[in-house]
Curated annotation (Swiss-Prot):
Matches recorded under InterPro entries: PRibTrfase_dom, PRTase-like, PyrR, PyrR_bifunctional
General function of this protein: Regulates transcriptional attenuation of the pyrimidine nucleotide (pyr) operon by binding in a uridine-dependent manner to specific sites on pyr mRNA. This disrupts an antiterminator hairpin in the RNA and favors formation of a downstream transcription terminator, leading to a reduced expression of downstream genes. Also displays a weak uracil phosphoribosyltransferase activity which is not physiologically significant.
Stated name of the protein: Bifunctional protein PyrR
Pfam families, A to Z: Pribosyltran (PF00156)
Keyword Nucleotide-binding: no
GO MF annotation, one: RNA binding
Keywords on record: Glycosyltransferase, RNA-binding, Transcription, Transcription regulation, Transcription termination, Transferase
Segments carrying motif PRPP-binding: 99-111
SUPFAM superfamilies in UniProt: PRTase-like
Catalysis: reaction(s): UMP + diphosphate = 5-phospho-alpha-D-ribose 1-diphosphate + uracil
Family designation: Belongs to the purine/pyrimidine phosphoribosyltransferase family. PyrR subfamily.
Superkingdom of the organism of origin: Bacteria
Length: 177
């Protein structure tokens, strides 16, 4: 059974609020780079970049990050990591920049830890922040989001499903029991 938690308008409002918070906390956007975690985090990052351009009249670089090779729960740790999956990210100048990692849902924190490992393998930014559309709790690692669209406390057996129009043909967040 699924329950709608956020419709398209609620998602838009949440992303707009995150955008304003990014501007306020960073005192502008000139030294910011947005990095979306594949798959849905990339589309959320692009939307935030579009809104930042509207508000600040500045093109924000947006990168895509594939963390599959960095997940400790999905790969054999004896195998060497390949940076080919993130070669497009290596083209971005992250040195001394403020990187904002963007994902759809924050849950255990393992995805974010893997993303930080991937970024540090590429370059060393001045700062890494985290923006998520939904924070559902249940952290296994000491990671928290700096920018949150909506906190949705869930039971361990529940699941949050984020759908974005770019790949799912609609914007909606559902809670699945």
């Amino acid at each position: 059974m699924e329950k709608e938690i956020m419709d398209a308008m609620a998602m838009k409002r949440a992303l707009t609020r995150i955008t304003y918070e990014i501007i306020e906390r960073n005192k502008g956007v000139e030294d910011i780079v947005l990095i979306g975690i594949k798959t849905r985090g990339v589309f959320i990052a692009k939307r935030i970049a579009e809104r930042l351009k509207q508000l600040e009249n500045f093109d924000i670089p947006v990168g895509e990050l594939d963390i599959a090779e960095y997940r400790d729960d999905q790969r054999n740790s004896a195998e060497p990591r390949s940076t080919k999956a993130n070669s497009s990210l290596a083209k971005l100048d992250l040195k001394d920049r403020k990187v904002i990692l963007i994902d759809d849902v924050l849950y255990t924190g393992r995805t974010i830890r893997a993303a930080m490992d991937a970024i540090m393998d590429i370059n060393r930014p001045a700062q890494i922040s985290l923006a998520v559309l939904v924070d559902r709790g249940h952290r296994e690692l000491p990671i928290r989001a700096d920018f949150v669209g909506k906190n949705i406390p869930t039971a361990q057996n529940e699941k949050i499903n984020v759908f974005v129009r770019e790949i799912d043909d609609e914007d909606v967040v559902l809670l699945e029991n």
